[in-house]
Amino acid sequence: MRWRLAFWPSACSSCRMSSAVTTSISFPPSHFVPQIVRAVLEAVPLGLRLPLVYNTSSYDSVATLRELDGVVSIYLADLRYASNKWGRRFSKAPDYVERSRAAIKEMYRQVGNLVTDEEGVARKGLIVRHLILPNGIAGSRDSLNWLVREISPRVAVSLMSQYFPVHRARRSPLLARTISPEEYDEVSRLVDELGIENGWMQEMGASRDYLPDFSREAGPFPAREDVKR
């Protein structure tokens, strides 16, 4: 009974969002999966109808993801590195490549390719984010080639150019700068070369747009109309 009461507020909150002008519920939840599953099971009979978006680095166990089969509608997954050397050095994840790829395979098995409604709003499917990093650290060619070969050329891919070095990254010669136009162009050419059919690519220069300024009274990010490309 104590467990049920602990999750009741989450279920009620989800239902309130479902009745408001909201298109989905997104969360980075890996360490709260059992609680999330219970909250959703309680919320659905109360009227929850929104797609649930699982926002993840992809450093998840397949066993954990299987607990979410039929619960999560959209997986928003990172594919950060193609080399465990960089996963170990920069993310303290020595087995990032194997673990993230196994996780993405399981996510795709559950939800498949991205499905949108008549207004273009995502309702179900997998979206893979790939952040372009300086000096080839992200292993973009290997990562994207793996996606096309092992997942699907139709999987939705979000190629991001917004990397901006802060804090300790500024002290690393490999990470201390934003990506160059040449690095951006090299990855953009991979879209056609590898036959990636669906997705988006940020414009060059997005790193400044997505750098939060918490001293702004109107919020940490500029309004959409203020962003200059």
Descriptions of predicted regions:
Residues 69-84, 154-163:
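Non-cysteine beta-strand/loop elements that form the S-adenosyl-L-methionine
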Residues 39-51, 99-110, 181-190:
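Alpha-helix-loop-beta-strand connector modules within alpha/beta enzyme cores
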Residues 112-229:
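Auxiliary Fe-S-binding modules of radical SAM enzymes
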Residues 2, 89-94, 171-178:
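Short glycine-enriched, charge-decorated loop/helix-capping segments at active-site entrances
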Residues 33, 58-61, 79-97, 126-128, ...:
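Conserved radical SAM core fold
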